[in-house]
């Protein structure tokens, strides 16, 4: 039965801007990194190109994209008041919420993959138009982006939880934007590895302990948040 709910959620994406967002966000990062590289007066160090892109993605574009994505997915139901019918169906509540969570995580993975592909296309383009040093390490970049995706699961679930809980789009926007800017301000803080919006950023840390803490809390914590969201939302009335 769950696969039917997931399929319905995927079909609903055609009516929203979610797919456009998932294409535009990684593309913006890849384009910006390419423009910055071509604007250099010195040779481009290809070994750090992927790290620069991953940092820009983890610090700002990914958390803001997750915020917007959670709002878009929730407003597909809140806007036309679809909850009033869907949530009255027997056993529908946990399945609907779980399907939305799975689709959102799938879209996050798709954005990570698209960014990886675009960076692999940008690297030879930069090398053909500008002097470069070193080589683009596709394997390292892919691994970093994959770990960032796992570490971002907790933020995804928190954002989706708030977006589904409130009919207004303001609370999830405040949470996402506030969390992103708080992460930027607390980047060098000792407790940064425990802050959800910094967990993906910590995949760039030289300290392996910080990376391990962030990916463990981000991944496992995301599953715990998902379970808590399903229990909470399944026991309450349609979002007010």
Residue ranges of predicted features:
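Terminal transmembrane helical anchor/hairpin motif
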Residues: 32-52, 173-240
């Amino acid at each position: 039965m769950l696969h039917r709910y997931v399929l319905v959620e995927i079909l609903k994406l055609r009516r929203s801007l979610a797919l456009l967002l998932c294409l535009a966000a990684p593309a913006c990062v890849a384009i910006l990194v390419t423009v910055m590289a071509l604007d250099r007066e010195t040779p481009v160090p290809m070994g750090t190109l992927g790290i620069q892109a991953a940092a820009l993605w983890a610090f700002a574009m990914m958390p803001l994209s997750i915020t917007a994505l959670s709002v878009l997915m929730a407003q597909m139901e809140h806007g036309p008041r679809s909850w009033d019918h869907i949530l009255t169906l027997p056993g529908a509540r946990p399945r609907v919420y779980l399907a939305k969570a799975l689709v959102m995580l799938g879209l996050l993975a798709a954005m990570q993959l698209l960014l990886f592909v675009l960076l692999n296309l940008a690297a030879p383009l930069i090398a053909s138009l500008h002097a470069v040093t070193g080589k683009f390490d596709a394997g390292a970049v892919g691994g970093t982006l994959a770990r960032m995706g796992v570490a971002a699961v907790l933020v995804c679930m928190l954002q989706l939880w708030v977006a589904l809980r409130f009919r207004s789009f303001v609370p999830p926007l405040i949470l996402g934007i506030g969390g992103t800017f708080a992460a930027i301000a607390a980047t060098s803080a000792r407790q940064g590895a425990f802050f959800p919006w910094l967990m993906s950023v910590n995949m760039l840390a030289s300290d392996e302990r910080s990376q391990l803490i962030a990916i463990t809390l981000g991944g496992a914590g995301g599953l715990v948040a998902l379970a808590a969201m399903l229990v909470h939302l399944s026991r309450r009335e349609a979002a007010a």
